Amino acid sequence: MRTDLPVVSFLCTALVLIPLPWHWRARNTATLSIIFWLGVINFTRGINSIVWAGKTINYAPVWCDITAKLIIGANWAFPSSTLCICRYLAQVSSPHHKIANASDKRRRMYFEIFMCAVLPIIAMALHYVVQGHRFDILEDFGCNPTTYVSVAALFIVYLPPLVLSLITLVYAGIALRWFVHRRAQFQAVLQSSNSGLTTGRYLRLIALSITEMLFATATTLFVLVITLEDNGLRPWVSWDFVHSDWLRVDQFAKVLAPQYFWDRYLLTWNMVPITSVIFFAFFGFGQEAKAEYARYFTLSDQNIPYQEQATTCSARLGARWNQYDEFDT
């Protein structure tokens, strides 16, 4: 059994859930979407790595159906959610931006719900078109989606996340450009936009988006290249041909697959944990995070009889957090 897989998965689940309370209060749809998808994928992977530790038996076919589709949806959801963030940043920093009224806010909310929730569901549904068989089970890793690699698969599975990532980088570049051009009065610009953003939070969101999308783009290209190298593009003969053996479940034991296969899979598997750590690094040490931690410790102090010790502890923690102010100036 690989104990590192469930440990990493559940640890990353906890990390991405830490910023949830203040983002929930802010009703930031795009950021909540990232938290949801990272949390769900990390958690289900942790379960998979326990259930299928050293095994490839098809214990839970319905569970695998669900988790395999969630992976497909997440591949679209990560870049589409980040696109929503960068699009909003580019809008609020633009010199042509007007203060949003109730109608504008509703349109933005509907757009973000479509991009963050509806679009991934569409991706999961479309995946059935190129789903050659039900799913794969990999020893230690568990359920994995399968794709009939063809021209149709390029346009349904591989290219959309790449295109979304590139569009996100364009929006991030526009947002960064407006910051550079208007940096002298940028805090006033953000205040006048009624966005609730500070300069530090604005830069942190841009940095997060660029980092995650560069990483996601590189990973997507890597997966696409090795998939084409290993399998090439298979001909799309007909719907019946592609789905002729749809109920099949392929099981991959460690001893039956070459080592390079497992090395490549582990490399791509690590994309979600790394993305989770990046997300926490940007959101777990900001001003709003420190305020939330202070609030938590204040509530905890009320239940501790030794107030002097609690006050001293809180003061030390406060001093320690102050060294993370670089994004909030």
Language model regions located:
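Cytoplasm-facing ends of alpha-helical transmembrane segments in multi-pass membrane proteins
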Residues: 14-21, 46, 72-99, 112-131, ...
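Membrane-proximal first intracellular loop
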Residues: 1-116
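Extracellular-loop-to-transmembrane junctions of the mid-late helices
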Residues: 130, 138-179, 199-226
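Intrinsically disordered, low-complexity terminal tails of fungal membrane proteins
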Residues: 106, 181-203, 285-329
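Class A (rhodopsin-like) GPCR intracellular loop-transmembrane helix junctions
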Residues: 27-36, 64-69, 101-121, 150-159, ...
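Membrane-helix interface motif
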Residues: 50-55, 128-141, 179, 224-238
